[in-house]
């Protein structure tokens, strides 16, 4: 893999449909990332692809470009009905489905192909109204897709392109039976273009590719190191009593443009949110207990820059592409080594640099040896002066008194406490 994020390969070098090239160039996409440069020559020949790549390497645009080109270059199945989409893109989470849909919209506007979105939690009738008007490309989560299929709101008999994104995550979340249910209602694999992407091409993912794809070509983009060479990693050893004050002091010193703070439990996340919101930070909370509409709103606010900090459990650690995240704080070291990689992979994306700061407290420091073995290197340790930690901190807010994402807006350093570093 090249040390630069982009390759010398240009999208315009491929025999892509002119409308697709126009849409890509309008969005500023000229050169391919490594996964795009490997996958597109195969998909443009109509060959199935199973791809392994880190998140943030451009795999979404790889399968969207392939999907739009294929549909524009091949006629729809004869006698296709209005409830029959031509392409199906399956994602493990609602947030990822929404994100893929947003990434696809510029291509849809340029090509005239219609998009549909289907995910659980809310919006059943709103989503259905779009489907009833007919869509070419349907993006969704498996549960809602099956619901619509059982009600005959959609029929998969005219599918020409299938994409399975975050396949390993599908297994982790127990969706594999749903995936197979949907595949059984499509035309045979030999009559479709099939694409699968995954952070890892494990045995079970390869088994799925063998089962549901047509002699898939495997393409892999291995990072130079699991954590990405553009991410500065840093580790502190705080006591449990000093942990929160250290986090707040680091936030004052670093003053990140956009940061995600990860913790291992929803209760810990709620506690962190309460401390940061009370201290005047523009902070949002993202856990499994947050209602779907609110989760999407918080993600939109964070992406727009209306929120500076997102406190999250690992529900947000995979699949979400939030641009320009400058810092990731591991308030708790994760129990799963892979979660460490996925967490800090929120920063340092698409060629940008990033900063990851981890707190190895008394409770979770035991997780560190396994993490360092997994990533293949020791995380550099930094020391702090306990006497220099912030002390004039307000009482934390409680969720019953304030809603996540609605903390006081931060127009400058709270009470002029910005540190010189």
Curated annotation (Swiss-Prot):
List the PROSITE patterns hit by this protein, alphabetically: DEAD_ATP_HELICASE (PS00039), HELICASE_ATP_BIND_1 (PS51192), HELICASE_CTER (PS51194), Q_MOTIF (PS51195)
Specify the Helicase C-terminal domain's residue ranges: 245-390
Spell out the GO cellular component terms annotated for this protein, sorted alphabetically and separated by semicolons.
cytosol
Q: Name one GO biological process term.
A: RNA catabolic process
Quote the catalytic activity from the record.
Answer: ATP + H2O = ADP + phosphate + H(+)
Enzyme class, top EC level, equals hydrolase
Instruction: Tell me the GO molecular function terms.
Output: ATP binding; ATP hydrolysis activity; RNA binding; RNA helicase activity
Q: Where in the cell is it found?
A: Cytoplasm
Asked if the keyword RNA-binding belongs to this entry, the reply reads yes
Motif range (DEAD box) = 165-168
Q: Where is this motif: Q motif?
A: 9-37
E.C. number: 3.6.4.13
Annotated region (Disordered) at: 396-421
Protein's job: DEAD-box RNA helicase involved in RNA degradation. Has RNA-dependent ATPase activity and unwinds double-stranded RNA.
Complex and partners: Component of the RNA degradosome, which is a multiprotein complex involved in RNA processing and mRNA degradation.
The identity of this protein, by name, is ATP-dependent RNA helicase RhlB
Q: Which organism is it from?
A: Klebsiella pneumoniae subsp. pneumoniae (strain ATCC 700721 / MGH 78578)
